[in-house]
Amino acid sequence: MENTQENPATQSAEDIGSAKQAAQGAAPAAEAADAALAEAQAKVAELQESYLRAKAETENVRRRAQDDVSKAHKFAIESFAEHLLPVLDSLEAAAVDTSGDIAKVREGVELTLRQLTSALEKGRVVAINPVGEKFDPHQHQAISMVPAEQEPNTVVAVLQKGYMIADRVLRPALVTVAQPK
C-alpha cells in the first residue's frame, strides 16, 4: 500500500509557494486598487473644493444683488430730487422778493409751475386730465353725476387732476360724469 499522505514539510513548502504566487498576483491588483482609490479620493477632494468655491461665489453674488437692490431703494429718489431743486430755488427766490409787483409774482409763479411740471415729467409723473373721455374707475373717481349733452358715463369736468407714475395711478382724477338720459 502506498502512502497517501504527503509529507507535512512538503505540503507546507507547496502552500508557501502557492501563497507567494497568490501574493505576487495580488500585489499588482492591490497596487492598482490603491491607485484607483487614491485617484478617486483626489477627485472627491477636487469636487468638494469646486463645490465650496461655487457655493461661496453664489453667496457673494446673492449678497451683491441684495446690496444693489438696497442701494437702488435708498437712492431711487435721487434723480427726481435733482429735478426738483430748481423749483425749490425759484420758490426761495420768490419768497425773498419784496418788490410787491403782482405781475412779476404771477410771471414767477407761472415759470415755477412750468419747472415743476417739467421735473414731474422727467420723473415720469404725468397728469390725468380726462375731460371728454369715458369714465375709467381705475384712473378716475366720480364725485357726482350731472345731466349733460355728452354720452352717459363721459367725464364732463375735472375737479382735481389725477397723476400717474409710469403705468401706475398715483392719485385718481376727481371728476364729474354725465348721467344717463
From Swiss-Prot:
Q: Where is the composition biased (Low complexity)?
A: 19-34
Q: Which GO MF terms are attached to this record?
A: adenyl-nucleotide exchange factor activity; protein homodimerization activity; protein-folding chaperone binding; unfolded protein binding
What InterPro entries does this protein map onto? Answer: GrpE (IPR000740), GrpE_coiled_coil (IPR013805), GrpE_head (IPR009012)
Superkingdom as given in the UniProt entry: Bacteria
Q: Which residues cross the membrane?
A: none
Sorted alphabetically, the keyword list is: Chaperone, Cytoplasm, Stress response
Where does the record place it?
Cytoplasm
Please give an example of a GO cellular component term from this record: cytosol
GO biological process annotation, one example:
protein folding
Q: Write down the Pfam families for this protein, in alphabetical order.
A: GrpE
What ranges does the record list as Polar residues composition bias?
A: 1-13
Its chief place of residence is cytoplasm
Q: Map out region (Disordered) in residue numbers.
A: 1-34
Functional summary from the UniProt entry: Participates actively in the response to hyperosmotic and heat shock by preventing the aggregation of stress-denatured proteins, in association with DnaK and GrpE. It is the nucleotide exchange factor for DnaK and may function as a thermosensor. Unfolded proteins bind initially to DnaJ; upon interaction with the DnaJ-bound protein, DnaK hydrolyzes its bound ATP, resulting in the formation of a stable complex. GrpE releases ADP from DnaK; ATP binding to DnaK triggers the release of the substrate protein, thus completing the reaction cycle.
Task: Check the record and name the NCBIfam families matching this protein.
Answer: PRK14139.1 (NF010737), PRK14140.1 (NF010738), PRK14150.1 (NF010748)
Write out the similarity annotation.
Belongs to the GrpE family.
Query: What interactions and quaternary structure are annotated?
Result: Homodimer.
* Protein name (record): Protein GrpE
Q: Which gene encodes it?
A: grpE
